UniProtKB/Swiss-Prot annotation:
It is found in: Cytoplasm. The keyword Cytoplasm applies. Belongs to the DeoC/FbaB aldolase family. DeoC type 1 subfamily. The gene is deoC. It comes from the Archaea. It is an enzyme of class 4 (lyase). Transmembrane segments: none annotated. GO terms for cellular component: cytoplasm. The active site is at D94, K158, K187. One of its GO terms (molecular function) is deoxyribose-phosphate aldolase activity. It comes from Thermococcus kodakarensis (strain ATCC BAA-918 / JCM 12380 / KOD1) (Pyrococcus kodakaraensis (strain KOD1)). This is Deoxyribose-phosphate aldolase. Catalyzes a reversible aldol reaction between acetaldehyde and D-glyceraldehyde 3-phosphate to generate 2-deoxy-D-ribose 5-phosphate. Could be involved in pentose biosynthesis. Activated by citrate. Inhibited by NaBH(4). Activity is independent of divalent metal cations. Pfam families: DeoC.
């Protein structure tokens, strides 16, 4: 997989709480230069990223995060956050599942929590990725989380926030792909810093990579 091809898998990410305006502009410039699929930024920075990319006439989507990084806010709060991010120009929303509710086996709540965000996103033509935060889940819970995300109409399942105790693993990506089937997206995120790691995730079934190391990944890829 060459530089140009792997770049289209990448959501170049800066979710640091202390990211400045300058940092976000740099992120957008990298996305333009390397041809990344999207930039992923905190909700407060969506408008800045969208306006800048639009001004540059760039073919780069803007993703943002909802209920991040804990997933423990009430559904109404996630919906409000989603609406605001969409108004500011987000094309994709990476929302965190309610992990505690999943562990309580309150599956109706978990599914509805996702479905409500999906509803507002799809009304505006935006996609939703559901972060299941694999590092906190048993195998059984990972399977259930993927099933609920699929039933709720989400577009992707995603491994990790990058703020938990662990990131993406090849095993988790493979399992998630097996559960959701070919028609849904799988995003691997958390700890992916090299071309080799990214390629492993893609071979395991990921069709999106979330990373703050997109430049390093592309530079490690063959030219052709």
């Amino acid at each position: 997989m060459n530089k140009r091809e792997i770049a289209r898998y990448i959501d170049q990410t800066n979710l640091k709480p202390y990211a400045t305006k300058e940092d976000i502009i740099k992120l957008c410039d990298e996305a333009i230069e390397y041809g990344f699929y999207a930039v992923c930024v905190n909700p407060y920075r969506v408008k800045l990223a969208k306006d800048y990319l639009r001004e540059k006439n760039a073919d780069v989507k803007v993703a943002s995060v909802i209920g991040f990084p804990l997933g423990a806010t009430p559904t109404e709060v996630k919906v409000f956050e989603a609406k605001r991010a969409l108004e500011d120009g987000a094309d994709e929303l990476d929302m965190v599942i309610n992990i505690g509710a999943l562990k309580d086996k309150d599956y109706e709540y978990v599914k509805n929590d996702i479905a409500e965000v999906v509803k507002v996103a799809h009304e505006r033509g935006a996609k939703v990725k559901v972060i299941i935060e694999t590092c906190y889940l048993t195998e059984e819970e990972k399977v259930k989380a993927c099933e609920l995300a699929k039933e709720a109409g989400a577009d992707f399942v995603k491994t990790s926030t990058g703020f938990g105790t662990g990131g993406a693993t090849v095993e988790d990506v493979r399992l998630m792909r097996k559960v959701v089937g070919p028609e849904m997206g799988v995003k691997a995120a958390g700890g992916i810093r090299t071309y080799e790691q990214a390629l492993e995730m893609i071979e395991a079934g990921a069709n999106r990579i979330g990373t703050s190391s997109g430049v390093k990944i592309v530079e490690g890829a063959p030219d052709e």
